[in-house]
């Protein structure tokens, strides 16, 4: 319910009470945050009574906090696209900034579990504290180059450079009866072209379940998890070619749920 403000790396200095931003339960469900130009932008999931927001709450919310005054400036809301749930709390890279200083926010759309809600990506441009009205990329129902079925929501996303990000798209077309996006073997690894709003299938990885899908920068490339019906492990991805090394760097018994490389 609270969010910690930060003035630079490691300098946590005051607790912000954001309960007033929550709907119905005084808990806005703070997700991923980023600091830019003296402001912290915090995605809000707005979950009520479970893992989803209410059916009639079709908007994406972000709290804006001034790090100089330690005060909440405002909550910004995007209400025209039908997006909901700004950022995925278990994916630290679902809110990120490109080289231009523009912030991108991945919205989950209630994991496709609530009718009428959509997943997509929003932007807050450099120097602004409001959503960019010219940018809203709808992921739900979008086509993926090299994939016959349409997208559901972005299960994970990791920004690399030059408008390209990598991650997984949950595809409801692969669900078996009674399955949801977490347990189903239905997540496809893709390249996100943020500037042109396009997705492309990454060859060499099978469909994964919804747990082994996270991606991290790794040395000069990326480490990408995968939990398919045959193998669970972490693979190396070359962002220059978008190619996967077919031999996993590490194999795991359980789902490789989180990855973070500590290096230069």
Annotate each predicted stretch with a short phrase.
Residues 14-26, 72-90, 130-152, 202-208, ...:
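Surface-exposed loop and turn segments in beta-propeller and other repeat-based domains
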Residues 55-119:
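Loop-centered beta-sheet repeat module
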């Amino acid at each position: 319910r609270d969010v910690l403000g930060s003035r630079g790396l490691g300098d946590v200095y005051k607790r912000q009470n954001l309960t007033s931003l929550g709907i119905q339960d005084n808990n806005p469900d703070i997700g991923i945050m980023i600091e830019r130009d003296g402001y912290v932008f915090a995605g809000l999931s707005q979950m009520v009574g479970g893992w989803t927001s209410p059916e009639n709450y079709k908007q994406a919310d972000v709290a804006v906090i001034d790090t100089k005054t330690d005060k909440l400036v405002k909550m910004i809301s995007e209400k025209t696209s039908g997006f909901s749930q700004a950022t995925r709390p278990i994916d630290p890279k679902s809110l990120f900034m490109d080289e231009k200083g523009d912030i991108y926010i991945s919205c989950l759309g209630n994991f496709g579990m609530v009718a009428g809600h959509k997943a997509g990506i929003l932007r807050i441009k450099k120097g602004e504290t409001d959503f960019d009205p010219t940018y809203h990329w709808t992921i739900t129902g979008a086509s993926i180059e090299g994939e016959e079925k349409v997208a559901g929501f972005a299960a994970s996303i990791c920004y690399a450079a030059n408008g390209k990000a990598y991650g997984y798209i949950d595809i409801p077309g692969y669900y078996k009866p009674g399955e949801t996006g977490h347990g189903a073997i239905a997540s496809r690894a893709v390249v996100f072209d943020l500037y042109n709003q396009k997705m492309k299938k990454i060859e060499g990885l099978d469909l994964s379940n919804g747990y082994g899908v996270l991606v991290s920068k790794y040395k000069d490339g990326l480490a990408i998890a995968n939990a398919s019906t045959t193998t669970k492990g972490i693979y190396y991805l070359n962002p220059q070619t978008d190619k996967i090394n077919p031999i996993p760097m590490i194999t795991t018994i359980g789902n490789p749920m989180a990855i973070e490389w500590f290096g230069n």
